[in-house]
């Protein structure tokens, strides 16, 4: 199992509001919201990701979570630093 898929496995039940808090702690800011519930977050170094947000307690599907994690470029060490993984 590679690091990306293991990170998805560890974060598969993470509520969206906790993922958004971690994005903001990592320096991402809300660029804009779409009419369909998507929130576009951007980092000063040029990374951009879209998080679909309807209810804070919702979780993302594994495929969507993997896409977000690939876009932000987090590793397991980053997830630990941001408090997502013990």
Residue ranges and their predicted role:
Residues 1-86:
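Basic nucleic-acid-binding interfaces
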